[in-house]
Each structure stands twice: as structure tokens, then as C-alpha cells.
Amino acid sequence: PMSDVFSFKDGDKNITLRYDLSSPLARFYAQNNQELPSIFKRYQIQNVFRNEKAGNGRYREFMQADFDIVGNVNPAQANAELCNLISSTLADCGLKKDQFTINVSNRKIVQGLIDDLKISEEKQTKVIRAIDKLDKPGFGLKGVEDLLKKERKDQSGAITKGADLSNEQAAQILNFLKIKDLKKLKETLKNPLSQEGIQELENVFQLLGYGSNLNQVKTNFTIVRGLSYYDSFIVETNLNFKVTNNKGKEIELGSICSGGSYAKLISRFRGVDVPGTGISFGVDRLLFALIQLNQIQVQDQKPVLVCVMDEKYLKNYYEIVDQLRDNNINAEVFLSTKKNLGKQLDLAN
């Protein structure tokens, strides 16, 4: 969304800060695909920038850890592998299996419904974003209904324009959002595109059944991901516990890892569709939760400068530094030829 992007001018240059890590990956793959393996796996950890309201675990500059599989892949296998990666990573972070849920769906399911309802193309983005708000704090079915119709007024009085759907169109979407069971969904939605999405989801679950992480993965047809480049499988991971904000109030933190499949993203740079699927951990948000669970101890540890009082003892000074570094303490020996203790302490300060 352009409103969420930090953009400005530097003289005659248009500057935009990095919004995510998926678009740069798509450009890199499009430019270098001849030199890359047919199945390209990549991870990237880097800061991104969002021009949106900050809050607990939500920042305007934050770190993402992305994992992607691009190329000639079996989509179900790639998506199942990423679900396993989410589960094993969170377990390695100290989270128990009942402390998080990996919600999955398929964008084709809701797109088929939108096509059946003959919702115009200019309204579809607003519809998708409205559905994506269902599980967000302060929304629920009533909030989504308002966004599907004329407008929604939040607690602060701010008004968001809705998709301006008819009552019948809005009612059909709200009925869809109440369905929880994959079998019932298959019986309800007859659109071929929706059926295709349901089958793709069943294929992922079949593969997940071969491993030990099936219990954490649940269908949730209300997740659609607000970014337009996701076109089939989508995943969103939420914590099953609340955290305490800086005002002492318990809150839901939101998604800590999300992603999906994006065959058409690379085509923007290369001109042909290339299968790709990926996930992104919100590192800052995850750390916020882990610190509250005492899985990570935050230490205010200061670096150490070993002062040089006599050069004949340099060997001893470096031995001290080695011992400090072995205990994960940042340390260094004073390097200047000026041996005045006051000058050395000035550097330390």
C-alpha cells in the first residue's frame, strides 16, 4: 500500500525506504535466474520501514527474517516445509506447542467468492483488506461489515471509507467468514477457483500429516493477507497468549510470522510467472513476546576496555580480553601509543 511506504525527494531523486524483503528478492531472482539453481532457497535478515501507527511490538522501523523457496517447486511441498520451519523455529525459541497457532488458507478461496459476487475490480482490494481485519483487535464481524459497506468509525472517531458493497454481497461474505470447517467450505463454495484453492490446501495438510507439526497448523479462511502479490497459499502465525504493554495492560500482540505464495510477484520484473513461496518473522515483535516469557534475559552489559599500563604486559592484557570475549563480553585492548591513563579512560567513556 503506497500510504504505508516512506517516500521522499532528495533533490531531483525519488527515494523510497525498503518496505519489505519480498520485492527485492523478486527483482534479484528476475535479474539472476540464469545463474541460480532451479530451486532457489534463500533467507535474509534486514530492517524494513512502514509509515504506520507505532505500538507495542509494532514499529516504523523493524527487523524481518525472511525465508523463501523460488523456482521449479512442488507448491504443496514448499508450503508444508515452511509451516514446519515456523513450528521448529518457534520451538527453538522456547515456545511450547500450545502457545502458538499457524493459521493457513488459500487466497483462491475468497477470490472465487468475490468473482461469484461480481464485485468490481476497484472494490476488491478494500474487500480483501476488510476481511483481513476480522481477527485484529477492535474489529470482529461488525467491524468487517462496516468496512464492507459504507464506512467504519473507530474508537477515536476516525472514519475509514468502506467498499460500498450491497447488503446481499456483504451478507454472503460475512456468512463465508463464519465457516470453520474445510469440508463444509468445500460443500458451500462451488466456484472452480475456490475449489482449486481448497484442493491445494488439502494437499498441504496431507504432507503435514507425515510430520509432527500438524497440531499447530489450523485452517482459518478469514486470513487473506493485505498485500496484493499473494495469490494462493497464505499463512499467519499468532501467539495464544497475551502480553503486557508499557501501560501495564494485557494486549494481543498480533501476527509474529506471516507469508504465502506469490507466483505473479516475479512476473512484474521478468514477464513470466515463477512459483515462489515465503514467510517473514517479525523479529522485534517475537523478541517482545519472548522477553515477557523470560525466554530471553535482557542484560545491560557494558563493553570493557583493557588499559595498557606497561607494554611488557601486553600478552597478559590480550589474555584478559580473550577470557572476556569467551564469556560473551565485548572487550578490547587500548591500541594507541599514548599510555596516559586519563586518555585511556576518556576513550572508555
Placement of each model-derived feature along the sequence:
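Positively charged, Gly/Ser-enriched RNA/tRNA-binding surfaces
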Residues: 10-12, 21-34, 40-96, 108, ...
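Internal hydrophobic scaffold segments of catalytic domains
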Residues: 113-116, 125-128, 153-158
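A generic structural motif
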Residues: 100-103, 126-131, 331-341
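Glycine-rich, mobile lid/loop segments that gate access to catalytic sites or pores
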Residues: 101-112, 118
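Acidic, His- and aromatic-enriched active-site or binding-groove loops in soluble protein domains
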Residues: 3-12, 117-148, 239, 243
